[in-house]
Amino acid sequence: YSAQEQGLSEGDVITKIGGRSVHIWNDISLYNLTHSEEKEVEITYKRDGKTHTAVLEPRQKEGDTAPLLGVTGGKMERPGFFGTLKYGAYTVKYWIDYTVDSLRMLVTGRVGMKDLSGPVGIVSAVDGVYQEAAPAGLSVIILNLMNIGILITANLGVMNLLPLPALDGGRLVFLIIEAIRGKRVSPDKEGMVHFAGFALLMVLMVVVMFHEKPVYIIEMMIDFME
């Protein structure tokens, strides 16, 4: 792979990829996933206290499911109490970046409506996570479900801050307009805009649900009753 050709070796610590800071291994995985169209990727890494840069070329060999750079994560370490808080914050940041990158891919057409998930998709994902984690025990189930919860929370937070009517981001736009104009926007007009935005969001939710598999819910209900 390209990493070995460019001189990277075991023990090197990647600190940046494509200009983004790397705090956890998932940061690298996310960049590769959401920037798979890039032919070259610049990375910054540390070795023996010195900073180096290299330009890597993603390559997909036989048996690979996606183009790879040739780097892997190191061994897991116990960072202590405060370190756990720090890396917990990095994990939340990762899920926020994941949400923002997903929106970017949606806007640019790299993903379509079939890739969106609504309530049905969320239930399906949670059930899938539970089924995979169940053999490993209760602690793994709780940890994986917490990760799903963080993802959903990050999605809701980012979406709510978008400058769209009916969302907090839309309300913020009106506050900025009022600050520039020096007077308040008519409450009736603002209410109409937010109502129209809410209606469009409901339509979008229905469209997304039609692209999912409602039969999944019926199957779950049958399994539960059995």
Question: Can you say where each PLM-predicted feature lies in the sequence?
Answer:
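Transmembrane helix boundary and interhelical junction motifs in multipass membrane proteins
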Residues: 162-172
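Functional transmembrane alpha-helices
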Residues: 34, 47, 57-156, 173-192, ...
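PDZ-domain C-terminal substructure recognizer with occasional recognition of PDZ-binding tails
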Residues: 9, 15-16, 27-72
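Residue-level recognition of oxygen-bearing side chains
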Residues: 2, 27, 121, 172, ...
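Alpha-helical transmembrane segments of multi-pass membrane proteins
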Residues: 151-160, 200-208
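Conserved PDZ fold ligand-binding element
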Residues: 3-26, 92
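Multi-pass membrane catalytic core of lipid/isoprenoid biosynthesis enzymes
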Residues: 188-203
